Amino acid sequence: MALTLGVAQAGSGVAAQTSASATTPSAAPSTAPSAVTTTLTVAAFPAIDEIVRSALPAWKALHPDVEVRIVSRELNDHHTAMTTALSTAKGLPDVMALEIGYLGRFAQGTGLEDLSGPPYNLSVDKARFVTYAFDQATTPKGAVLAVPTDIGPGALLYRTDLLAKAGLKESDLTASWEGYVAAGVKIKAATGAYLMAHARDMKDILIRTGLEPGEGLFFDKDSRPLVNTPRFVRAFELARAVRRQQLDAKVIAWSSDWSEGFKRGGIATQMSGAWLAGHLNTWLAPSTRGKWRSAQLPEGAFAAYGGTFFAIARHADASRKPMAYEFIRFMTMNRTQQLAAFKAQDAFPALIDAQTDPFYDQPLPFLGGQQARRDWREAADHIRAFPVHKQDNFAKEVIDTELDKVLDRGKDIPTALADAQRLLQLRAHR
């Protein structure tokens, strides 16, 4: 789940306190129970912090002697703080939330606790989770470094009114990627609306299609870059086709221009996690209620957009690790809590038990009464994990830079990909 919004309250460190009834050698034993309080520190980001906060009354009912302190920061600041804490073993929380885009960086090191075996035995619960999400947290050597809590099954959200004006139907968007671009030409001619926010969106999804077993997004299992491959060539070519035909608004996700494009009907489609439908409904473009629908991604593609995990640092306070894991289990393996997070924050459950509920059959008024949650559940079933690499974030920056040179300066695609390949080769083993 890519919930990167909101102003977060900064903080760090682990808070724990214990107290007991005082006695002296000559005093008679007290019959009153000891008041022992443990404080767990949970480091999170919006809107995971709100999900945790909402779960605390139910947690306290089960564990009245365990307090939970939430330390919340903006998404990037949070992960920077966790990187520092793991590298210095100082200021470590008991539980840390990690977004999938950052998990690879953490997984390459030795800072996270392996939860697969005793005393946690997470591997026993593997079948309870969406396969690809559990696999994302599993290293090539079989260590499981985090527990998935929510996922972001990909969807194509589109404006039915704009399609109707262009004489198009959903299948015109989804039959093929080339057909999707061709539909964009008709939409632009008939309505003036752009097909998508940014041509980069096309690249982002297409490089995730057609991966061979064992291949990562940018690197293979031996850290060799995979940029000079047909999927990158096609991704760049179709992104360039979008830009050349002026089908993208050239706006970046979460910018004010992006949200205005949705409000004013200037952007006809958006590929994203299913959670975006909730954001459009609640604050991005509530006035467009009923005009949107959700479809599977074009050409039978399935992809994940975001996802959140809970982890324990290897050097976190050992005395609190059992209770920290109990808290993680409560957040991730409790059907009631998983459904509550979905209903309140559009955090699609990673727990399979929480994917069978009448809530999935409810029509969504924002999507014109469509029972879209069924489609999102189906998409989650088809998504497959690919290995993450510690240089994935760097690789994404390189690819984005080279694509921008193609889109904005007319750089030829073979040269752009060759330059990216060279840079990734230099960085792959660092």
Segments from the language model and where they lie:
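Extracytoplasmic/periplasmic substrate-binding proteins
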Residues: 236-326
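Glycine-centered hinge/linker elements that transmit conformational signals in sensory
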Residues: 183-186, 222-252
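Extracytoplasmic/periplasmic solute-binding protein
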Residues: 140-149, 154, 178-225, 267
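Hinge/lid segment of periplasmic solute-binding proteins
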Residues: 100-153, 181, 210, 291-293
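C-terminal lobe and pocket-closing loops
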Residues: 279-287, 300-401, 429
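Short, solvent-exposed loop/beta-turn-alpha elements that line the ligand-binding surface or hinge
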Residues: 116-129, 173-175, 195-196, 215-234, ...
